Swiss-Prot record:
InterPro entries, sorted: Ccp1-like (IPR044831), Haem_peroxidase (IPR002016), Haem_peroxidase_sf (IPR010255), Peroxidase_I (IPR002207), Peroxidases_AS (IPR019794)
Keywords for the protein's UniProt record, in alphabetical order: Heme, Iron, Metal-binding, Mitochondrion, Oxidoreductase, Peroxidase, Transit peptide
Name of the gene encoding the protein in the UniProt record: CCP1
A Pfam family per the record: peroxidase
Name the UniProt record assigns to this protein: Cytochrome c peroxidase, mitochondrial
Species whose genome carries this gene: Kluyveromyces lactis (strain ATCC 8585 / CBS 2359 / DSM 70799 / NBRC 1267 / NRRL Y-1140 / WM37) (Yeast)
């Protein structure tokens, strides 16, 4: 990875960044009962639909594709260059963080019980998912990607959203994320009901229960939450306000160090929601603080705080799983490792 972030976000103001998993903090895994499974739903989302889920379904089969690194590197480069060129977005935040949030929210609707929702079908493009209150603010990310899809109309929306997230992470000095193509756009009636994205106001029990639906274990959960090193929450989008730290446009293990080393006070924000703040103007969500309040999560937080390389390794594995949940990839669809713009001297 390049160590020169300035080439990508040349005029970023690191004090006014915004972002990623925002309203829906990532949560954790557990071997829960059916009642626990139901309780992980985001009942604070007023559009939550209590319709019953179908029986367990087989994995979606990805479209078979010839291994072609150059083909997708061109798409990666166009996304990365657009991020670089349009860096004025949101007070010079740039689009990187919100693209990661889009990839996560598209994948985060997956349900292991019946293989509905998730990263395969690109259903964010339909009104019901676009207008899910948990997706407030992601419309800007989707609009940003429209010219990319117009240039590459053969690219499915599921591939576009996931590839954009990978691109953003790598261009923000994060780890190299192996990515596979072959997701297939599905019809509107396959759009998951609102309410599948997480409620950031909850505790560790909720976190585990939520990520049980996504088949994640504790270590993967803590790794995924490390993406909160990026950007900030917005009151108008998520009901929470503030950045998680200082270096909000660089992918690091800062999130864990801030959890452990800062003094956090619980307040009620202007939206009436509880959040933690410190004297530097940073914040933590209740689901973030759950990681240091839980005796099983805490040792993992300490490990990642002390070893960024280990965090990158674990995050990479977990993020790949997130983007591939419920998908059966043919052998021909081999993982692609993209070069950053800096690595290509672009």
């Amino acid at each position: 990875m390049s160590t020169t972030f300035g080439n990508v976000f040349r005029r970023v103001n690191v004090k006014t960044l915004s972002f990623i998993v925002g309203a829906g903090a990532l949560a954790g895994s557990a071997t829960g009962t059916v009642m626990e499974y139901q309780d992980m739903r985001n009942y604070n989302n007023r559009n939550y639909n209590k319709q019953k889920l179908a029986a367990l379904a087989a994995a979606h089969v990805a479209a078979k594709e010839k291994y072609d690194v150059a083909k997708y590197q061109k798409v990666y480069n166009d996304i990365a260059l657009k991020i670089r060129d349009e860096d004025e977005y949101d007070d010079f935040i740039g689009y990187g963080p919100v693209l990661v949030r889009l990839a996560w929210h598209c994948a985060g609707t997956w349900d292991a019980k019946d293989n509905t929702g998730g990263p395969y079908g690109g259903t964010y493009r339909f009104a019901m998912e676009t207008n899910d209150p948990s997706n407030n603010g992601l419309q800007n990310a989707a609009k940003f990607l429209e010219p990319i899809h117009e240039k590459y109309p053969w690219l499915s929306h599921g591939d576009l959203y996931s590839l954009a997230g990978v691109t953003a992470i790598q261009e923000m000095q994060g780890p190299t994320i192996p990515w596979r193509s072959g997701r297939v756009d599905q019809p509107e009636d396959t759009t998951p009901e609102n309410g599948r994205l997480p409620d950031a106001s909850k505790d560790a029990k909720y976190v585990r229960c939520f990520f049980h639906r996504l088949n994640f274990e504790d270590r993967q959960v803590v790794a995924l939450l490390g993406a909160h090193a990026l950007g900030k929450t917005h009151l108008k989008n998520s009901g929470f306000e503030g950045p998680w730290g200082a270096a909000t446009n660089i992918f690091t293990n800062e999130f864990y160090n801030n959890l452990l080393n800062e003094k956090w006070d619980l307040i009620t924000n202007d939206a009436g929601n509880k959040q933690y703040v410190n004297d530097k103007g940073w914040m933590m969500l209740p689901t973030d603080m759950a990681l240091v309040q839980d005796p099983k999560y805490l040792p993992i937080v300490k490990e990642f705080a002390n070893d960024q390389d280990t965090f990158f390794k674990e995050f990479t594995k977990a993020f790949v799983v997130l983007l591939e949940n419920g998908i059966d990839f043919p052998q021909e669809n081999k993982p692609i490792k993209f070069k950053t713009l800096d690595a290509q001297d672009l």
